[in-house]
Structure formats: C-alpha cells, structure tokens
Amino acid sequence: MAGRDPRDRAPRVRNRAPAAVQITAEQLLREAQERQEPAIQAPKQRVQDLEELSEFQARKRTEFESRIRYSRDSILAWTKYAQWEASQNEYERSRSVFERALDVDPRSVDLWIKYTDMELKARNINHARNLFDRAITLLPRVDALWYKYVYLEELLLNVSGARQIFERWMQWEPNDKAWQSYIKLEERYNELDRASAIYERWIACRPIPKNWVTWAKFEEDRGQPDKAREVFQTALEFFGDEEEQVEKAQSVFAAFARMETRLKEFERARVIYKFALARLPRSKSASLYAQYTKFEKQHGDRAGVELTVLGKRRIQYEEELAYDPTNYDAWFSLARLEEDAYRADREDGEDVEPMRVREVYERAVANVPPALEKRYWRRYIYLWLQYAAFEEIDTKDYDRARDVYKAAVKLVPHKTFTFAKLWLAYAYFEIRRLDVSAARKVLGAGIGMCPKPKLFTGYIELEMRLREFDRVRTLYEKFLTYDPSLSSAWIQWTQVESAVEDFERVRAIFELAVQQSLDMPEIVWKAYIDFEAGEGERERARNLYERLLERTSHVKVWISYALMEIATLGGGEDEDGNEIEGEAGDADLARQVFERGYKDLRAKGEKEDRAVLLESWKSFEQEHGDEETLAKVEDMLPTTRKRWRKAEDGSGELEEYWDLVFPDDEREANPTSFKFFQAAQAWAQQRAGQGEEGGLSYDLPSDSEDENEDGDEDGDGREEEGMDQD
C-alpha cells in the first residue's frame, strides 16, 4: 500500500451540484446498443451435389457419435442424433439410433414417445403400433403411453382396437381418470350399456363414494332412474349403517336425496335425509344438515322447516360447547331449544320422551365451575333451577324435580357461599306439593347452614302468606339476633306488628332498634316518629324529636320537628265510616322550634343550614303566620357578599367566593356600621323604587325569591340525610 501511486486514486469531487444535462438509463442502454459490434455469424454452406452431401452427413454423424461416446447416458444427445437421421430421411439409421438409446435406458418415457412420434411423422403406423405395444408392456403404469396408444387407434377409427387397449389397461387397475376415459370412449360411440358395465367394474375396483355418485348420475342422465336408485341402494348397503360408515357415505346420501328431489320424489328425499341424520352425531353432519335445511325451505312445510332449523342450531351450540364446556349461556340456549322441541312434539300429539332434554341438562350441570367463587356459580345455579322447573311443569315428574333440588343443594359449597334463590325455590316447590312442613324444614336447614338476609326475608314472607304470625315473630328474633344492624329488618318487623295492631310491641321493637348500632339509623328514627304521629301521639313524637336532637342537630331534624308541631295528627274514620277530626297543631310551638333550631345552628356556625332553616321558616310563616311574623323572618334572611380568601392549594393567591351575611351576626359584630349599612340599603331600595340608578356596589341583592324555591327543594331532599348524624 505504501508504494501506491497517489495519481491512481479517483479525483475528489469538488462541485456536487447537479449537472446541467442529465443522463438517463434509457440513453445509456441506447448508446451501448448502438456501439455494440455485430455478432460473428457462421458462414452458410450450400450443398451442390451428392458428394458434398455425403461428406456433410459423414461429418455430422462423426460429431454425433463423438458426442454420445462421451455422454452415453444423455438421452437428449441420442434423441437429437435420431431426429437428425430422420430429417435426412434415413429412417433405418434413425431406428438404429433409437434402439441403441433404448439399450442404454429402456425405461425413459420421453425416449419412447419421441421414437413413436418419429414413426408417426413418417406415417409408419404399424411401426408405431409395435413401439406402443412394446412400451406399455415394459411400462404399464405410465398413463401417457396408454393415452397416446388409444388416441392413435381412435384416430385411425379402429374403435375395437382402442377398446382392446383399454381392456388391457384396465387389467392393471389404473386410476379413476383412466376409467373415466374408457367410459367417455363408449359414450362417444353411444355404447351406454358397455359404459354401465365399465362403471360396475370401476366400482368393484375403487368403491369410493365419489365413484358411486358418478355412476348414479350417469344412469340418471341416460334416462334410467330405477337403475340409478339401484346403484344408490347398492352403495348404501355396501357402506352399512354404522356411524363411521354413514359419515363416510354422507356424499352418497346427499346425492341420492338430490336425485329424488330432481325427480319430484320429495318424500323419498326427506326419508333419505332423516335416515342419514338419525345415524350421525350433530358435530359430524353440518354439511348434510345444511342441505336438508335448504331442501325443507324449498319443498317442505312449516313443521319440516322448523325441525331442520332446530337441528342446525343444535350443531351450532354443540360446536360452541365443544370449544368451552363452561359456556353456560350456550347450555341455556341448547336446553331451551330442546324444551321447545319437546313441547312442540307434545302439542302435535306425538308420544315423545323427555330423554333428550334431560340428557342436555345432565351434561350441563356436570360442568361444575372450576373455582369456588360466587361470580362463577351465579349462571351455573340457574341451570339447576331451570332443570327442576322443567321436571315439575313439563314432565310432571315431581319426585325427579325434588331430586334435582336436593342434588343442587348438596353440590353448592355453603360454607363459602350460598344461594337464597335455590333454598326459596326448593321451599316453594314443596308448598306447591302441599307439604308445608317440608318447606319449613328446607328453609330451616338453609338458615341453620348459611343464614343470610334474603333467606330470612323469603322465609318470613312465606309465613306471612300462611298467616303464622307467631312464627314470623320467631323468625324476626332470629334474623335480628343474626344481624341487629339491619335497619330495614327492624322496620319490617314493626310493620308486621302494626298490621296486627299490637302497638305496644311496635314501640318496644322501635326502642330496641334505636339502641342498636344500625347501618341506617335515620330511617328507623323517621319510621318511629311517623308511627307515633300516625297514631296521634304528639307528645310521644315530641319526645322522640328531643331524643333525636340530643344525638344530632341537623337542619332537617329541626324543620321536620317544626312541621310536626303545626301538622294535624290522628284522625281517620271510625267503624261506621264517619270521619274523626285529628288534633290540630300549634303555630307558636312550631315557631319556638324554628327559633331553637336557628339559635343552635348559629352557635355552631352552620351558615348554609341556617339559610335553609330560614327559607323553611319563611314558607311556614307565609302559610300560617301574619305580616308581622313574616317580616320578622325576612329581616333575618342573609344576603350574599363577594369576598376574597387565600386559595386552599397553598399557592398564597387569593380566590373569590360568595359569603352569606346574616343581619344578626353583623349587628353583634359591628353595631355602628350595621345601622349605617341598613340606612344605606334602605336609601338604595327607595331610589330603585323611584326608577333611579344607583345602589351599593359592594353588596349584591340576595335573590331571596329564587332562593326560596331552591331552599325548599333542598330542605325536602335532605330531610333524611340530616338524621344520619347519630
């Protein structure tokens, strides 16, 4: 590398800008083609006389002999040599070369074909026949030689000779294409009986469904339907009635039915379809079912179409279940499908057995969920319930339905979770069988094994329907011993006692309830107060409100307390239907409650609750008060004022908010400025009344009329929420 001349290196390109004239690949190719020198052509030789011809032939033979001497196994060299001799009309020499080549490779199909082609070109027919005879004797499994031999004889109109060649060929039991060629030969010359005999020999050699169908189609096309039926019947007898054999012969059944359809024999076709489908499993007969469905839609009645659609849907569901056996939706669909089919057959007057439906249900419930989690079992347990309902309603097999319920109860892992719907369905089944004691035993076992609120509720509802109030009380005692925090259970118990007019027991139950740690204590207190108010016991209701206010001082409790004081309690109708006037309320007591509530909320600094209370108080005064009391409440209503405070995100920035300003708070905090503020506000209202512009820029109007409606709605909607401060 050190002695390399630097001048040999390629020059460095300094200007990388594109050239003004661009050269394309097309120009390069065109220029290369123009500059290409002409190829050397061999001189043409013209033979002038026989001497020169003999010299030329001798030279070419020498070349060919030299070539095959060095490449003796090259069939191409031998073929070229023989064909050149044939081109010189030296057929004897050409045959000699071909024979020498056959000595080298007698099994070369290409060599035999070119040898026969040479003889045929020279119109040496007998030589060609002899060659074909030698070839098929030596190579009987090469179809090309047979085809060429047959074609030669038929071309020469030697049909009998062609038939003899086919007969020799058929002795070797060739493939189906050879048999079909033989049959087509006979058809071309209208030898249909011979063709039918060939079909029979072909079937004996290769009895596959396709060949049977082809034979039957041939007989049908030549106007022999009875013969075609005989062919199909022979085929079906050959394949047999076993499942595997019928599956193999599906195409034969389908072709047989299609032929009968073409011949307008619809009942025959229907019988053929049903015969095959009855012996095949649903998963293996999808195509046959599809053809049967199409047949029924075209030529069947409504019942037949429904039956075929039923079978098609069966196959679809079976395929889904084969992929996922725990697909309970597919099991439900399949079970409903079988139930509908069973009911339809029974309505048609057929004597059907429910074995197919039971088989589906048994297979379905055998697929137990893999995990002990209730979310996996929810759909599964409905299979058992639907199974039991089918046995009870459709088959009237009550003992079997009871066994289904028992098996389901035994299967569920009750220590982990249970299903109240299962226990209740089992119990109501026993009720329908008029066995009340058995139903009680079932529900008792369920409560003893796995108590849950829904199970208690269902058992209590059953006893209520039976009017067994002592049992209902016992059940409620067990229910609340199991879970004393259920507010709804306490209320339901009091409703039961109210229905039997045992009011002292109702009060005792409520007293027990309010002493418990309830999940929703506000609804229990409200129910207790509503009960006393409904009985006209205002003093008892007042005591309950006082006890409730000791626990919570929510604004809704105060509002409800005040409205109770003004409401009319008691009343109703006596035994004769005469109306009884209730005890009227006292507006002064209601105002006292409002005042107490306002003071309590003011002491706690609850501005929003105070505003809600004042709005309710204002509505009360508008309905039950006079102008003086209403004006007093309106003077207590707050106004809105825009103020600023530090942001809660800790950034130190100020944020704007609207604050409620109560007159009594301002009066106590700034008595002097409050008087000035009142005078300024009165002056602003006076000017507004005269139609002049002006006002206080720092004090916005309170919009008390709009807030009236909003406050009332809020007050009513938050009534129960206020009692949740227990």
Curated annotation (Swiss-Prot):
HAT repeats lie at residues 55-87, 89-121, 123-155, 157-188, 190-221, 223-262, 264-298, 308-340, 352-386, 396-432, 434-465, 467-499, 501-534, 536-567, 585-626, 635-667. Residues 682-726 are annotated as: Disordered. Keywords: mRNA processing, mRNA splicing, Nucleus, Repeat, Spliceosome. Residues 702-726 have a biased composition (Acidic residues). The keyword DNA damage does not apply. Its main location: nucleus. It comes from the Eukaryota. One of its GO terms (cellular component) is Prp19 complex. One of its GO terms (biological process) is mRNA splicing, via spliceosome. InterPro entries: HAT, HAT_Syf1-like_N, HAT_Syf1_CNRKL1_C, Syf1-like, TPR-like_helical_dom_sf, TPR_rpt. It is found in: Nucleus. SMART domains: HAT. SUPFAM superfamilies: TPR-like (SSF48452). Pfam families: HAT_Syf1_CNRKL1_C, HAT_Syf1_CNRKL1_N. The keyword Phosphoprotein does not apply. Belongs to the crooked-neck family. Involved in pre-mRNA splicing and cell cycle progression. Required for the spliceosome assembly and initiation of the DNA replication. Associated with the spliceosome. This is Pre-mRNA-splicing factor CLF1. It comes from Cryptococcus neoformans var. neoformans serotype D (strain JEC21 / ATCC MYA-565).
